[in-house]
Amino acid sequence: MARYRGAKLRITRRLGDLPGLTSKIAKRTSRPGQHGAVQKKPTQYGIRLEEKQKLRFNYGISEKQLMNYIRQAKGIKGTTGTILLQLLEMRLDNLIFRLGLAPTIAAARQLVSHKHIQVNNTRVSIPSYQCQPGDVLSVRDNAASKSLVNTYLESPSLSQSPQHLDFDKKNLTAKVLGIVDREWVALKLNELFVIEYYSRKI
């Protein structure tokens, strides 16, 4: 399944607040579609599917990528759902978004892809790059990169950076202090339902 490039507010009307997808708020609160205003009792499968879709659309990843992350999470000691969220949260594009250097994860992905971002003083152009504690993230020292990021910094963003990131706004650098705690994940969802959705697929 390819990455979604359609109307973002249509997705948030169906799935709820997805901070990584858009900060805009839909004026219409009913679900999209001809029968969107009709309240239907959700099935257990439907509930789990919806939680999975929240994860995909918020982080901007494909079905194949999500399945790979779940396989990876299952191979790490600990609670699989929490580890899955930590893997997604420690992606470079997500950290750039959480720092407020981009208004959405999609915008952060472009910053990384266009080589505006450095990790430990080395340009990294892979949005899915898995950051580690001790890594130092920075904006390239050129006028174009800094101008673009400063414009983004003026846009509304999440209220505060999570505690595992130490951000120097003046110098546009940040240090990764550790792995994100579950409580600092901005997306509201039940990750256990996501793991249950894939239980027979992986």
Curated annotation (Swiss-Prot):
GO terms for biological process: ribosomal small subunit biogenesis; translation. Gene3D superfamilies: Ribosomal Protein S4 Delta 41, Chain A, domain 1, RNA-binding S4 domain. Residues 90-152 form the S4 RNA-binding domain. Transmembrane segments: none annotated. It is found in: Plastid, Chloroplast. Its main location: plastid. Keywords: Chloroplast, Plastid, Ribonucleoprotein, Ribosomal protein, RNA-binding, rRNA-binding. It holds the Pfam family S4. Signal peptide: none annotated. One of its GO terms (molecular function) is rRNA binding. One of its GO terms (cellular component) is chloroplast. SUPFAM superfamilies: Alpha-L RNA-binding motif (SSF55174). It comes from the Eukaryota. PANTHER family: 30S 40S RIBOSOMAL PROTEIN (PTHR11831), SMALL RIBOSOMAL SUBUNIT PROTEIN US4M (PTHR11831:SF4). One of the primary rRNA binding proteins, it binds directly to 16S rRNA where it nucleates assembly of the body of the 30S subunit. Belongs to the universal ribosomal protein uS4 family. Part of the 30S ribosomal subunit. Contacts protein S5. The interaction surface between S4 and S5 is involved in control of translational fidelity. This is Small ribosomal subunit protein uS4c.
